Amino acid sequence: MLKYRSDKDSLGPVKIPADAYYGPFTGRAIKQYNVTGSPSHRNLIKSFVMIKRSAAVANMKTKAINRKQGTAIVKACDKILAGKFVDQFLVDMINSGAGTAFNMNSNEVITNVALRVLGKKQGQYEFLHPNDHVNMSQSSNDTYPVSYTHLTLPTSDLV
């Protein structure tokens, strides 16, 4: 029998599979943005996670987040870049206009993997938060288009 946890954000609680690494925003988005039935491509996930990793490093350097939080985020990103947890990026490839749903799916997965790195359980956002820490200094209006630009660079004749 599938077990669930109750994850909550500013919009309220959402029933999430207990072993899931995504959170409440993603739980809602899976239902709201079921356009194609296909999640985002793994190369987009990789590109996006690289941006999140870089932001965590920059936020540690400026002391916007503490080293413990930042290091956990970096380690979580490294695990995802190594191919782990990619199955947790479930938001449909066609989602909200500026990629907000994909951005939040990414923030929640990175946060929950980082929480496990810290020895915590998924959803214990009082220790590390998807918006306050993983998304710090970022906007999906910037990160989403940059990730697509990043995807084109390795195969571009201009590089």
State where each predicted segment sits.
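Short, conserved aromatic-histidine micro-motifs
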Residues: 38-54, 118-135
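Acidic, Ala/Val/Gly-enriched low-complexity intrinsically disordered segments
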Residues: 157-159
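Generic N-terminal targeting/processing segments that precede catalytic cores or assembly contacts
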Residues: 1-93, 105-109
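Conserved small/polar residues in nucleotide/adenosyl-binding loops
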Residues: 149-155
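A generic, well-ordered mixed alpha/beta core segment in the N-terminal half of proteins
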Residues: 103-115, 119
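Cytosolic, long alpha-helical scaffolding segments
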Residues: 93, 117-119, 141-143
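Mobile "lid/hinge" segments at catalytic clefts and subdomain interfaces of large enzymes
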Residues: 130-140, 145-146
